[in-house]
Amino acid sequence: MKILILGAGTVGSTAAESLSEENEITVVDLNARHLRELQDRLDIRTVEGHASHPRVLEQAGAADADIMVALTDSDETNMVACQIAYSLYRTPVKIARIRAVEYTARQELFTPKGVPVDTIISPEQLVTDHIEQLIHYPGAHQVLDFAEGRVRLVGVMAKAGGPLVGQELRQLRRHIPHTDARVAAIYRRLENNGEDEARYETILPQGDTVIKDNDLVFFLAARKDIRVMMSELLRLEHPVRSIMIAGGGHIGFELAKRLEGTNRVKIIERDPERARHIAERLKSTVVLTGDAVNEGLLEEENIESVDVFCALTSAEEANILSSFLAKRMGASKVIALINRPSYAKLVEDQYVDIAVSPQEITLSALLARVRGMRLDVGQVHALRSGAAEDLEAVAHGDEKTSKVVGKAIEDIPLPPGSTIGAIVRGTDVLMAHHDTVVEAEDHVILFLTDRTQIPSVERLFQVSVSYM
């Protein structure tokens, strides 16, 4: 496919890298240096210029593009670019990142007769959803939905005291005989050797794999079984009651609005005007005007009794500092918005319990839409700074036209570093075992430790030309 990406920032660059294996990619940006850096490491075409100017879009090939993805830092530029691509070039699929709630709250704007955006990606909405899931499952590092939430991929840091820690995986069935779950991958921290950045070994587990203390374990389970499986890997934490949020922007405000009915919520916001604005719109949340890196303020507000401290400002350095301070002063758990993978790797596990990457979450939503052009895909989630992916693919065809339908999982030629974790068949959730047979229209949940194998998975699920 021919894909036109507008914006060579973090998300645009990562999207170009993720999609360049089997697509013709053109990236447009005003920054010549960013474009040169991309061309030096990827086989792509670049065009320097303003992303919403017709001349630039024409030069970039908008008339021939199958998909245009508008990922610049400006909502207005992204929307205008989609309008021009539709009006002048009839580009078939137009995807835009739109941050401002003032736009996304008015869905009636986004129609062919209005602003012709086919898919809106709203980072603020996606990040809020993600953090809400983490708070709902104390102890989880990631909670990702598949098959409309019937199956979830959960990442948990295994801790001594969990019944399965120190045991072979084959013992899982004996521990919880009435619960079916599948460990999809394990990331094991390697010896530091004086390096600042932690490195991990990737393990595709077998029955004799032993889970160790501090392993990051990703498992798949039906939604109803998540807590049972988590209890095998660590001592379950008590439900979250007290939450403190640093930053009253869109994410902090929306998260407080969702949680204040069931939790004690406080927001610390530096801007007095913004603090007044959100205080008027929240019911029981306590809104404080001040700086979250003010040790006296945190002490006064009893930071030591806070179950979860969320650093959600737009400045990741401030998020890191306030997280470090909150953790040192006794907050039970700290969640921080951190965009740069290099920052996240440095601080996670030491000063921040969970680093949430808006770029990675945005990329997941984008990949799901783009992969769906080649393959019938329900969900795609980027993991480990985009190095790994978990995806939901629908098996079409029959035994004659499909490479997967009618075959047991052990007989499916999966690419290296990939595994099938679960199958959703209608309303039933089936954990994948070696003799599980894939049927037509099954939703197959795959885990890939190496995203470069995605094209191989796409070919595996394609049906032959005789399929109608």
Describe the role of every protein-language-model region.
Residues M1-M468:
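Cytosolic regulatory regions of ion transport systems
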